[in-house]
Amino acid sequence: MNILKSVTLIMVFLLNLAPAAGQVNPFERVTISAAKAGQNLLVNIGIPVSAVAARTDNPEELLDAIQSALDDYRTAFSLDEAAGCRLEAGDIIRLSSKPDTGGGISAGWEFFCENSQSLSAVDINLFSIIPISSIEGLAFPEGQQVIYPDLPKLVFE
């Protein structure tokens, strides 16, 4: 679990240091980060309240629904069954509103994958629960990607 928290913090830090060119502040975007390290896979999702506020009259209610949906990680993403990944740990944290970030949700999961070389992408399912046009992604160490509903994958290359 300590590995999950450490890598999650590092990935959030990296996303904040290097937003994609022409993109808004990462605190205003839904983000997903994934890192493969040997047979371990770490996935982190950040959902700021500002990313959903314009899409509903009650952003806190929408965040409550999203947080409940994330109890099953497959609501947010899925993994190729051939990789043989099993969930080792997961955390979903509701962030309190602060002037610099505005609050939201931070979620992270750690998997052990029997055949991690078979894992070429993380399939993103978030578009079905969050009405957004894109997600900022980071596949570590490959780099940043913008993920759209018509090609909802965070690709490892």
Regions found by a protein language model. Name each.
Residues 18-20:
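Long, low-complexity intrinsically disordered regions enriched in Ser/Thr/Asp/Glu with frequent Gly/Pro
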Residues 7-16:
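Bacterial N-terminal signal peptides
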Residues 1-6:
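Positively charged n-region of N-terminal signal peptides that target proteins for export
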Residues 22-157:
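N-terminal soluble domains immediately following signal/targeting peptides that reside
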